[in-house]
């Protein structure tokens, strides 16, 4: 298999790209305070209420055979999960409760829209 020199080649690079994309969107676009964490989660997000959320970022660059993007939450018990669809440069945000304990989430490309991203980010301000 030949690799494109501009495409990340390993899961760590893909994950790191997603973390930076999520941090950019949450900090620069919405003004939330972000800290990168290397440990039990990927980011800490400080809400205007001063509540700190533990954030796990999951990234995908290649759709499945059905055309959807698949995200695995691993063993994380973060407060929220940010799913980054790198090819579309869009994110979706879900709380632990919304995922209902499922370890894998599959999202169609149509579920990644600018409106959905904006609504998800706005929802953080209600927490």
Per-segment meaning from a language model:
Residues 26, 43-45, 51-61:
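Conserved catalytic cores of phosphodiester-cleaving nucleases, focusing on short active-site segments
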Residues 31, 40-42, 67-71:
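Short secondary-structure capping micro-motifs at structural edges
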Residues 92-94, 98-127:
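Non-catalytic C-terminal interaction segments of nucleic acid-processing enzymes
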């Amino acid at each position: 298999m030949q690799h494109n020199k501009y495409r990340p080649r390993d899961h760590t690079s893909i994950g790191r790209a997603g973390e930076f994309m999520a941090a950019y969107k949450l900090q620069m676009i919405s003004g939330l305070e972000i800290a990168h964490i290397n440990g039990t989660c990927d980011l800490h997000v400080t809400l205007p209420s001063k509540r700190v959320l533990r954030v796990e970022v999951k990234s995908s660059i290649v759709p499945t055979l059905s055309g959807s993007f698949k995200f695995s939450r691993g063993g994380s018990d973060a407060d929220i999960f940010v799913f980054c669809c790198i090819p579309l440069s869009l994110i979706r945000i879900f709380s632990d409760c919304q995922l209902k304990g499922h370890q894998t989430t599959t999202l169609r490309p149509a579920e990644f829209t600018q409106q959905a991203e904006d609504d998800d980010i706005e929802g953080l301000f209600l927490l």
